[in-house]
């Protein structure tokens, strides 16, 4: 049988969340995903996932748009290739479509999974080999009222989590910082704490806010100003008493080059979807390491498919500030046969071929949007 690629399909599914997850501009009660399946003539199927954190507010791509882009443009571009690998497929997609990193990442992920299954190797092994069997998880807390969020933080602390991320930006900076400070008081001094306004502050507010966050015991501030304003980020980094973590300011390889040259951040949050795929996220990591910028494994609130892809990449990094792959634990259900495993606040990196997880076709049919 031929190993040539025969089809690429994209299916939208909607999964409810275990509790509302408040972000800077929206509150999630469910998560929508695009499941990609790349089928080859020899019977192998590679799987990928397109996912945005709560809709198009973050990067501009919607779940519906991701599916339309894959069906109408990206899949036809890849299927024209004789034997598409992740790299050659990305080049083909770039020729036909500008931007759209989340859609491209979903297709590329499926091809990495297919390549790993054919070789009998995990994606981490294909990338050079894993450095870590487990990854430390920073638990993502919702941007909701302090008492409710504090109770959740204390519960997760008892489960073994040693890192916590405070979502911010939904209310004015003053009361928001007071809310975070009240929650922080419930946690011991030795846990990692990250505050994320999602670029909601102007530079003046951020300068005052970072000092206030430091006084409350927060160790890291993620993207306090708009992603485009790398100059302000650099100025804040030069004066801030806490570590500055770039996210929206680091969406492309070119962004990463600018950050490394300007030393605009202490750390960078890398995400497979926002980078446009595993290969480009890996390239960004290489640039960050060369520039002395620490790596933080970011999340787009993915299922076990997206979490497995990111974990495969993150496990190859020699040093990792933290990792935020909490998506599977925020979802009521998953769409793989055996979901990603978590133990004592750490994620166990799958060791099987490709992504190391297998799609549950019955659940895909059940949760598929009609």
Language model: regions and residue ranges:
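Flexible C-terminal active-site loop/helix
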Residues: 3-8, 13-17, 28-34, 41, ...
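Conserved, mostly hydrophobic/aromatic
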Residues: 5, 36, 43, 74, ...
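Metal- or metallocofactor-binding catalytic centers and their adjacent structured scaffolds
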Residues: 9, 39-118
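Short Gly/Pro-enriched turn/cap motifs at secondary-structure boundaries
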Residues: 24-29, 99
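Hydrophobic faces of well-ordered beta-strands that scaffold small-molecule active sites
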Residues: 48, 135-141, 164-166, 193-197, ...
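Glycine-rich, aromatic-flanked loop segments that form ligand/cofactor-binding clefts
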Residues: 106-142
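Metal-dependent enolase-superfamily TIM-barrel catalytic cores that perform enediolate-based chemistry
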Residues: 128-240
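Shared catalytic-loop signature of beta/alpha-barrel
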Residues: 211, 217, 228-243, 250-346
């Amino acid at each position: 049988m031929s190993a040539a690629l025969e089809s690429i399909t994209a299916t939208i599914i909607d999964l409810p969340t275990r509790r509302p997850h408040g972000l800077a501009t929206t509150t999630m009660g469910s998560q929508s995903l695009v499941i990609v399946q790349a089928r080859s003539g020899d019977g192998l199927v590679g799987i990928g996932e397109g996912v945005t954190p709560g809709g198009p507010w973050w990067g501009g791509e919607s779940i519906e748009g991701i599916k339309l882009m894959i069906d109408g443009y990206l899949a036809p571009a890849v299927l024209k290739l004789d034997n598409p690998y992740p790299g050659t497929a990305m080049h083909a997609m770039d020729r036909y479509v500008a931007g759209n990193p989340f859609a491209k990442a979903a297709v590329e992920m499926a091809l990495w999974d297919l390549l790993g299954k054919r070789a009998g190797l995990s994606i981490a092994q294909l990338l050079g080999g894993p450095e870590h069997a487990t990854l430390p998880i920073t638990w993502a807390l919702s941007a909701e009222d302090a008492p409710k969020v504090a109770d959740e933080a204390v519960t997760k602390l008892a489960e073994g989590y040693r890192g916590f991320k405070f979502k911010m930006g939904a209310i004015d900076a003053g009361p928001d910082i007071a809310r975070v400070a009240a929650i922080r008081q419930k946690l011991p001094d030795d846990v990692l704490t990250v505050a994320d306004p999602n670029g909601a502050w102007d530079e003046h507010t951020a300068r005052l806010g970072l000092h206030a966050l430091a006084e409350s015991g927060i160790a890291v501030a993620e993207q306090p100003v708009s992603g485009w304003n790398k100059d302000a980020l650099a100025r804040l980094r030069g004066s801030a008493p806490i570590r500055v973590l770039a996210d929206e300011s680091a969406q492309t390889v070119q962004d990463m080059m600018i950050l490394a040259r300007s030393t605009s951040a202490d750390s960078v949050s890398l995400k497979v979807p926002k980078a446009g795929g595993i290969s480009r996220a890996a390239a960004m990591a290489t640039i960050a390491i060369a520039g002395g910028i620490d790596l933080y494994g970011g999340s787009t609130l993915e299922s076990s498919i997206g979490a497995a892809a990111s974990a495969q990449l993150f496990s190859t990094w020699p040093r990792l500030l933290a990792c935020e792959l909490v998506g599977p634990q925020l979802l009521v259900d998953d769409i793989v046969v055996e979901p990603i495993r978590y133990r004592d606040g750490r994620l166990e990196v799958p060791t099987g071929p490709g992504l190391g997880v297998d799609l549950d076709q019955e659940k895909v049919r059940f949760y598929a949007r009609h």
